[in-house]
């Protein structure tokens, strides 16, 4: 899979852009704060309809403009797909091959993209919300049902939390309605949790192999999904998970009413990374964090390929300078001939380009792009 051409209008600091891309390696070079990361963000947004940097789509629209537009043609092994997005202050619309999509879940997955940035170090040391967002973004683009259930979960969770707050301040007393919301939320939660268990198991297998190779077989990486409902185990099916979530709601009801919020479910779950049986959150050095993050990204590539039969587009935002020569070589060797790759950097020096053959280089300056001569 590769992005053959790309257009944008009024996105971040870009007024207008139209360009073709190389199917293999594309390098965006230029000083900081010129738009390199914004361009990668735009490509990522075209794929997932979400930014990795903000939850507010309004921030993506260029100051003084009423909307932003993105468009691109994606080549897959069997077909070509035209993608288009339009963002306004009121929301976004999506088109596939000029047909407007009624739901974004029908759009996401047409183009798969994996992003690796310095902020990914937070995957290990950051808050649980960082790891939950990671799961939702990555699993949502490979499974439209996961994306659908995640959207439904947020809506019903908000309803249930609002009603719990009403109960907490004595403005409501209908426990039967709370039962209805609990049953609905538990059913959706079970669908999400069962998929997370499945995908984390696969991701763990790929990441373990990648990490072993990068570390020279010196370290063993393990990734575990940690549901907030402690009774849930990996062998549970959807129905069993549902029953355990419902039981958790009933057990926690007095506390939930007192606090006015739902205390368990996918929105409270977490991931745990172990290095040689030790919790990486507490013990991993910065170098080990980088190796874990890199291993997870390489595992994502394999997971997407397994489930879609296509290699995703890889976006590397200012990470080459963060990796030593060995990790750079491992990364470039791993992706060579597999993925279309976009790399941002301020300087071509000090990077292991020996594996990359004739990359296409673009200069980014003040929201403009120009291809550099070979």
Swiss-Prot record:
Keyword DNA repair annotated: yes
SUPFAM superfamilies given in the database record: P-loop containing nucleoside triphosphate hydrolases (SSF52540)
Annotated binding of ATP, by residue: 30-37
PROSITE patterns from the UniProt entry: RECF_1, RECF_2
Keywords tagged on the record: ATP-binding, Cytoplasm, DNA damage, DNA repair, DNA replication, DNA-binding, Nucleotide-binding, SOS response
Source superkingdom: Bacteria
Keyword ATP-binding tagged: yes
Subcellular location: Cytoplasm
GO CC term (a single one): cytoplasm
Pfam families: SMC_N
An MF annotation (GO) of this entry: ATP binding
GO BP: any one term: DNA synthesis involved in DNA repair
Family: Belongs to the RecF family.
Function recorded in the entry: The RecF protein is involved in DNA metabolism; it is required for DNA replication and normal SOS inducibility. RecF binds preferentially to single-stranded, linear DNA. It also seems to bind ATP.
Protein name: DNA replication and repair protein RecF
Organism: Lactobacillus gasseri (strain ATCC 33323 / DSM 20243 / BCRC 14619 / CIP 102991 / JCM 1131 / KCTC 3163 / NCIMB 11718 / NCTC 13722 / AM63)
